[in-house]
Amino acid sequence: MIRQRTLKSIVQMTGVGLHSGRKVTLTLRPAAANTGVIYRRTDLNPPVDFPADPESVRDTMLCTALVNDEGVRISTVEHLNAALAGMGIDNVVIEVDAPEIPIMDGSASPFVYLLQSAGIEELNTAKKFIRIKKPVRIEDGDKWAEIRPYNGFRLDFTIDFNHPAIESDDQKLVFDFSSQSFIKDISRARTFGFMRDIEYLQSQNLCLGGSFDCAIVLDDYRILNEDGLRFDNEFVTHKVLDAVGDLYMSGHSILGELRAYKSGHALNNQLLRAVLADQEAWEWTTIEDEQESPVAFMQPGMVLA
């Protein structure tokens, strides 16, 4: 059977908070089967837990933030959540001594490296998948996102930026998920933003950790980063990375195909909520025979070494 996964050991990294600009320490701890993904703020006394849950996502303005009923939040979880999805981690406790996860280089790659450093341990409990049974679609003006039945996990994503630095041929990506392909083709794509927006936010005491080290930065005509892009379609690839993380806010891998046009964190979250609210749209399933596993969730082998 396909088994649940956790980490072999405790790992830690430090980075800078995107919004505060301050040093943040992140600690990942192994967890028992059926624990799920739990974010924990240890800077509060007592510590506050935020289980991965689409209903906890209450702010998607500048990042994905989990907010509890008392208004306590933990921000910028999306890239770490994408790395957890990419590595198939079902059970982990994520401790952070600040109100936000460190931004690192603006991609999921540092978190993938951290997970690989910890090592992956398979537990003797079946992994529970969310299998999509019928199409569900959410629209917002000309933006839309829908998820459909599919034996695997596929993302078909289109963006539409009218900008000289973003070629029209590089605004669509179809990605068939597997751990190897996520690490190789998706995890290194960085978030992006416009210099005018960053300057405005910093004038409002926000985005104080924003810099060329953690994002692709554009003005009205060009990319301002000296090293340019990591690959030609990095913009749409990062949107796919975001969607992988957003859909994993259920805490479970999905068997289905996401199709999206100009979607972002908010629409992705609305779609996930709509799916889970419709009992006829999905079902729990396990994969007892690994030979019958979709390629997306076959044993990653050397990735886990």
From Swiss-Prot:
Catalyzes the hydrolysis of UDP-3-O-myristoyl-N-acetylglucosamine to form UDP-3-O-myristoylglucosamine and acetate, the committed step in lipid A biosynthesis. Zn(2+) binds at H79, H238, D242. InterPro entries: Ribosomal_Su5_D2-typ_SF, UDP-acyl_GlcNac_deAcase, UDP-acyl_GlcNac_deAcase_C, UDP-acyl_N-AcGlcN_deAcase_N. This is UDP-3-O-acyl-N-acetylglucosamine deacetylase. SUPFAM superfamilies: Ribosomal protein S5 domain 2-like. Its EC number is 3.5.1.108. Keywords: Hydrolase, Lipid A biosynthesis, Lipid biosynthesis, Lipid metabolism, Metal-binding, Zinc. It catalyses: a UDP-3-O-[(3R)-3-hydroxyacyl]-N-acetyl-alpha-D-glucosamine + H2O = a UDP-3-O-[(3R)-3-hydroxyacyl]-alpha-D-glucosamine + acetate. It is an enzyme of class 3 (hydrolase). GO terms for biological process: lipid A biosynthetic process. Its cofactor is Zn(2+). Belongs to the LpxC family. NCBIfam families: lpxC. The gene is lpxC. Pathway: Glycolipid biosynthesis; lipid IV(A) biosynthesis; lipid IV(A) from (3R)-3-hydroxytetradecanoyl-[acyl-carrier-protein] and UDP-N-acetyl-alpha-D-glucosamine: step 2/6. GO terms for molecular function: metal ion binding; UDP-3-O-acyl-N-acetylglucosamine deacetylase activity. The active site is at H265 (proton donor). One of its GO terms (cellular component) is membrane.
